C-alpha cells in the first residue's frame, strides 16, 4: 500500500472578483489552515487577497 501524499495541489481564488487565477501546492501536515496570499488579479489589475478553494 502506498502512503498518502503530503503535498496537494490547490487553487487560489480572488476574494474580490472570484476568479481562480493561480494553482500552487501546499503541505497538508504543516499547513492545516486555508492558505491566503496577496497576489495580482489580472481582471482587476491590482494586488488582492487570494484564498485557497476546494
Curated annotation (Swiss-Prot):
InterPro entries from the UniProt entry: Ribosomal_bL33, Ribosomal_bL33_CS, Ribosomal_bL33_sf, Ribosomal_zn-bd
GO cellular component, one term: ribosome
Keywords associated with the record: Ribonucleoprotein, Ribosomal protein
GO molecular function, one term: structural constituent of ribosome
Short name of one Pfam family: Ribosomal_L33
GO biological process, one term: translation
Keyword match Ribonucleoprotein: yes
Origin: domain of life: Bacteria
NCBIfam families documented for this protein: PRK00504.1, PRK00595.1, rpmG_bact
Family: Belongs to the bacterial ribosomal protein bL33 family.
Protein's name according to its UniProt entry: Large ribosomal subunit protein bL33
Amino acid at each position: 500500500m502506498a502512503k498518502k501524499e503530503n503535498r496537494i495541489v490547490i487553487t487560489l481564488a480572488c476574494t474580490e472578483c472570484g476568479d481562480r487565477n493561480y494553482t500552487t501546492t501546499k503541505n497538508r501536515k504543516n499547513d492545516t489552515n486555508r492558505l491566503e496570499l496577496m497576489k495580482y488579479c489580472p481582471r482587476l489589475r491590482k494586488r488582492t487577497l487570494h484564498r485557497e478553494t476546494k
